[in-house]
Amino acid sequence: MGQDKALMRLASKTLLECTHDLLQECLKSIYVSIKEDQIGDPVRAKFKLIIDKYNQSGPMAGILSAHKIHPNSAWLVVACDMPWLDKKTLEQLMEERDAAFDATAFNSPEDDLPEPLCAIYEPNLLSGVLSNSNLLPTNSPRDLLMQSKVKVIDAKNPNALKNTNYPGDDLSEIES
């Protein structure tokens, strides 16, 4: 995209701030995963941070770093570039979670594959990845979900799973 999507603005807030505010409505504890070179960023400094500690690039480094800090916790993972995400969609994901699976994820309306960046990852799956790197041949959370036992659910509001990928994406119709 050419710019840090977390810092894109939606009205008076960044997408990261909007996502954090939304998660606060549903969760007790929220962490923001960052790369080491983002440590001094003033927007991110407002939040509880998890610094990526693994060689994986992208979201997988953050997911594994979070698991390393709290290895017995399931992790609800949300990308900050989903400005249409709403509380009802997060509640649906949490209500339909099944810890007997490796993860619970929405069926992506774009490609009918598990949506890895609005999903709940169970601790057994993440422990398995850390103890056996063969479980993660790529750095892709989606690939991990596709080779795991995942409860895939259909979002009641599939539009909530849209992300913003282009500088020209129209965010004007989103309520802040």
Q: Predicted segment positions?
A:
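Nucleotide and nucleotide-moiety/phosphate-recognizing core
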Residues: M1-T138, D143-K162, P167-L171, E175
